[in-house]
Amino acid sequence: MKTVLVTGIGGLTPRSITGIIRENHPDYHIIGVDANKKAIGFFMKGLLDEYFVCPRCTDPDYFPWIERLVDEKHIDYAFVQPESEIIEWGDYYEKNGKFPVPVFMGCKALSVSLRDKSIMAELLEGTEFIPKTIKVTQDNPRYEDVEKEIGFPCWIRATEGTGGLGSLKIEDISSYKSWLFINSFIPEFTVSEFLSGRHLANEMLYYNGEYVKGASLECAEYVMANIAPSHVTGNTAFGRFLNEDRINDFCDRCIKFLEKKLGVPAHGILSFDLKEDKDGNMKVTEVNIRHMAYAGVMAHVGFDLIEDTIKIMEDGNADRVERAPFFHYAKPYIFLRDVDVAPIILEGESVFK
């Protein structure tokens, strides 16, 4: 029996991860923490054995609190999910030479570079991996560059955050100015060429620079899409699991480029969001430094990076993790998701005909 800590338990992804741990290891003692006292994961029957409200990760009391919890509850390892916490844990490691408890995550340099979309865009500028992209701010909106360098239609989104924060297809300069005004609370954005093709996603596991395992899917429709001006809410309502090796290959080449650029090995879970252009060429729109929201539903169709992460943290190596850089699903599975219901997996789209 192990005692496992899951941070950010109010979020969809940490709850999904916890559900898989509970299914795979019913005897494990799971502790959830969140800075929000109303975190829904606290109150989901059967999900957790214990829960605690913790300080925010930027609070000076955060790590002393975590250290006490680890010591008092004899925690064996942790799933740290919110990206803000991952950055802080990386900083803790750099200062102390160790984590408060074993985790599986990459170094701070890679995490910081991928979390901020503008830094990622600068690192990948001029490559095949991203669309034409510039960074703009409320103080320097670069109207002329947006119009002449990027052109319309274009795509705008916040440099940090998930769930499509601050994103919209912009048709003209007037709409661009209006969007900045409406989102005056967001200090920085990236503006890029508009991509009209499929929205793809890929989750990958790296261990000390080795690409160990990866699988992909298509985000075809979004939950409550009509409530967001961009129609992208961050949660997929209908998705297709894909056996397209070119997606995995493209993402791995992108990571290898970043490894060389930053001088650090990829390590941990990296999750890509991609869009295809009108010709089907893939472009990276985001790389998350954690498990993605689909981790649980992917586990149910045979691609279980949650269990692989447990193996790595328990063994201290990746020897027991299957090498499957081009993982193929057994069937053309699809999934349906919505609010307040568990995802539904179907064996194909023939049921819709």
Range-by-range predicted roles:
Residues 1-105:
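ATP-binding N-terminal substructure of ATP-dependent carboxylate-amine bond-forming enzymes
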Residues 34-38, 83-85, 210-211, 217-221, ...:
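Short glycine-enriched loops at secondary-structure junctions
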Residues 62-72, 143-149, 180-182:
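Short amphipathic alpha-helix with an adjacent loop that forms part of the alpha/beta core around
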Residues 73, 245-353:
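ATP-dependent carboxylate activation and anion-phosphoryl transfer catalytic cores
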Residues 96-166:
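A conserved helix-loop-beta module that forms one wall/lid of the active-site cleft
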Residues 130-131, 153-155, 165-198, 256-262:
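Conserved ATP-binding module of the ATP-grasp superfamily
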Residues 193-199, 203-259, 288-313:
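ATP-dependent carboxylate/phosphate-activation module, predominantly the ATP-grasp catalytic core
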